[in-house]
């Protein structure tokens, strides 16, 4: 049975290291564990999960899923690309799907360079600082858009 809603959950550089990298900041769950938790929490949604260390691969994935059609939106943790990738910003701006920017940590309580996001202005919203729940809130935000 085909789900009525399909979402892409996309993660950028270094998020493949979750569970190992700075667990006091990012938590102890791996990215696979986070993805499984999202799928379990929202069984009515068909998810595609994607992670890359490479900016171009993230951009290509956005364009690919838009070209395929059938996706209702994207939950995006761009990692460090959040702070400097004009190319990713332009790609988000170029697609018609809504994108929610999410972060595990509260970036505004961290180093100054993390306070600026170049992608926020082209996303429908930003969720940060709630750990794994940031992803769940991002999914809920996209699902709620159908009620507006």
Curated annotation (Swiss-Prot):
Protein's UniProt keywords contain Amino-acid biosynthesis: yes
Pfam families linked to this entry: DHquinase_II
Species this protein is from: Chlorobaculum tepidum (strain ATCC 49652 / DSM 12025 / NBRC 103806 / TLS) (Chlorobium tepidum)
Xref: CDD domains: DHQase_II
Name of the protein: 3-dehydroquinate dehydratase
Pathway entry: Metabolic intermediate biosynthesis; chorismate biosynthesis; chorismate from D-erythrose 4-phosphate and phosphoenolpyruvate: step 3/7
GO molecular function, one term: 3-dehydroquinate dehydratase activity
Residues the UniProt record annotates as site (Transition state stabilizer): 21
Family (UniProt): Belongs to the type-II 3-dehydroquinase family.
Self-association state and partner proteins as the record states: Homododecamer.
Reactions this protein catalyses: 3-dehydroquinate = 3-dehydroshikimate + H2O
Active site: 26 (proton acceptor), 103 (proton donor)
Biological role stated in the UniProt entry: Catalyzes a trans-dehydration via an enolate intermediate.
One example of a Gene Ontology biological process annotation: chorismate biosynthetic process
Gene name tied to this protein: aroQ
Keywords: Amino-acid biosynthesis, Aromatic amino acid biosynthesis, Lyase
Disulfide bonds: none
Alphabetical list of Gene3D superfamilies matching this protein: Dehydroquinase, class II (3.40.50.9100)
Keyword Methyltransferase among record annotations: no
EC number: 4.2.1.10
Family annotation (PROSITE patterns): DEHYDROQUINASE_II
